[in-house]
């Protein structure tokens, strides 16, 4: 995914 995704551990996956 190329959208920021928020996870329960407080981290986020963004465009890399």
Swiss-Prot record:
Function summary: J region of the variable domain of T cell receptor (TR) beta chain that participates in the antigen recognition. Alpha-beta T cell receptors are antigen specific receptors which are essential to the immune response and are present on the cell surface of T lymphocytes. Recognize peptide-major histocompatibility (MH) (pMH) complexes that are displayed by antigen presenting cells (APC), a prerequisite for efficient T cell adaptive immunity against pathogens.
Keywords: Adaptive immunity, Cell membrane, Immunity, Membrane, Receptor, T cell receptor
Compartments reported by the entry: Cell membrane
Coiled-coil regions, chain positions: none
Gene that this sequence comes from: TRBJ1-5
High-level lineage: Eukaryota, Metazoa, Chordata, Craniata, Vertebrata
Protein name in the entry: T cell receptor beta joining 1-5
Principal location: membrane
Origin: domain of life: Eukaryota
Presence of keyword ATP-binding: no
A GO CC term assigned to this protein in UniProt: T cell receptor complex
Annotated GO biological process: adaptive immune response
Organism: Homo sapiens
Quaternary structure note: Alpha-beta TR is a heterodimer composed of an alpha and beta chain; disulfide-linked. The alpha-beta TR is associated with the transmembrane signaling CD3 coreceptor proteins to form the TR-CD3 (TcR or TCR). The assembly of alpha-beta TR heterodimers with CD3 occurs in the endoplasmic reticulum where a single alpha-beta TR heterodimer associates with one CD3D-CD3E heterodimer, one CD3G-CD3E heterodimer and one CD247 homodimer forming a stable octameric structure. CD3D-CD3E and CD3G-CD3E heterodimers preferentially associate with TR alpha and TR beta chains, respectively.
């Amino acid at each position: 995914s190329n959208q920021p995704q928020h996870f329960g551990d407080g981290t986020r996956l963004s465009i890399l």
